[in-house]
Amino acid sequence: MADKKSPLIAVSVGEASGDLLGAHLIRAIRKRCPQARFVGIGGELMKAEGFESLYDQERLAVRGFVEVVRRLPEILRIRRGLVRDLLSLKPDVFVGIDAPDFNLGVAERLKRSGIPTVHYVSPSVWAWRRERVGKIVHQVNRVLCLFPMEPQLYLDAGGRAEFVGHPMAQLMPLEDDRETARKTLGVDAGIPVFALLPGSRVSEIDYMAPVFFQTALLLLKRYPAARFLLPAATEATKRRLAEILQRSEFAGLPLTVTDRQSETVCRAADAVLVTSGTATLEVALCKRPMVISYKISPLTYAYVKRKIKVPHVGLPNILLGKEAVPELLQHDAVPEKLAAALADWYEHPDKVAALQQDFRVLHLLLKKDTADLAARAVLEEAGC
């Protein structure tokens, strides 16, 4: 273990959303403990904060049951290596951010060796596989929850958990500012603008981007002046998007791919087509109407459909307790249906205004000083 004035904090993330949380956490910890050091698995944003990544985070960014099975030997090899490295380094605390199937296994092994463990972002145990709660309580010392309905599940099982709010709700302004967003991106104020968010992982891009681009072509026929914006989450996804856009069917599509800037892109848009996941919450906090879509391998879909315990898959719909925005999944994730649903938002501003009121209420519910609350909990577990 390190000197408590300069604790060694191990962190592991599996995808772009976890990288963002990790970067904010590092910053907040450094405000309280400037000499803290960070090591583990992280992405580009965490590295920019001085994080030492022992393995390539992109290698863990895999979705779906079938896709995970294909990459399982490599993922297990990375996990074994990370456990071995951290047992040698003896960090003061281990923080697994999201990616529960990977990080909870690491946490369990480290906890058995006396290293305090924290899991930041509860798995969706309220949606499916609720039986995991008891196991998670044994794997980690503490769970930091982003949604208010989560802590009680762990407390009822004898664990320690707390609601720290959602970092996006803290960081993003309550008020809308479409004009500034469009100026920033060089987009005309008077034209139809649609944002496309096909996912943060290369595997998601492979499934969703072609469908989203075909949807954009249909919208372009309906609105010839339309522009399309797509924020690339990582360099790897940007490269894959460029490869897909080289197909002849997408020639001439008025699409701008940005380096990240997802919030600015969403604020500039009239409506957003988004892959199910954390990005749906970001769109809601931007107060933008959206259509949620997702498409995975048939085997993965059949497995998930049997296990899911909630009527919706999109976070805004789950948190609001109703289908506030359309969800077009799997067989319904076709360009014709997606384009029609986006056009419905664009052509009905009264519906958009009502939705924005719902999203404002949701924003206020989730708004806390998340990074600082998480930093305080992590340092407490580290004995600082």
UniProtKB/Swiss-Prot annotation:
Name the UniProt record assigns to this protein: Lipid-A-disaccharide synthase
Give the signal peptide range. Answer: none
Report which reactions are catalysed by this protein.
Answer: a lipid X + a UDP-2-N,3-O-bis[(3R)-3-hydroxyacyl]-alpha-D-glucosamine = a lipid A disaccharide + UDP + H(+)
Query: What are the GO BP annotations of this UniProt entry?
Result: lipid A biosynthetic process
Q: Give the EC number(s) listed in the UniProt record.
A: 2.4.1.182
Q: Name one GO cellular component term.
A: membrane
Q: Which PANTHER family match?
A: LIPID-A-DISACCHARIDE SYNTHASE, LIPID-A-DISACCHARIDE SYNTHASE, MITOCHONDRIAL-RELATED
EC top class, in one word?
transferase
Report the InterPro entries cross-referenced here: Glyco_trans_19
Species of origin: Neisseria meningitidis serogroup A / serotype 4A (strain DSM 15465 / Z2491)
Q: Which domain of life is it from?
A: Bacteria
> What does the sequence similarity comment in the record state about its family?
Belongs to the LpxB family.
* Pathway(s) the chain acts in: Bacterial outer membrane biogenesis; LPS lipid A biosynthesis
This chain's function reads: Condensation of UDP-2,3-diacylglucosamine and 2,3-diacylglucosamine-1-phosphate to form lipid A disaccharide, a precursor of lipid A, a phosphorylated glycolipid that anchors the lipopolysaccharide to the outer membrane of the cell.
Pfam families associated with the record: LpxB
Q: Which UniProt keywords apply?
A: Glycosyltransferase, Lipid A biosynthesis, Lipid biosynthesis, Lipid metabolism, Transferase
| Keyword NAD found | no
The molecular function terms in GO held by this entry are: lipid-A-disaccharide synthase activity; phospholipid binding
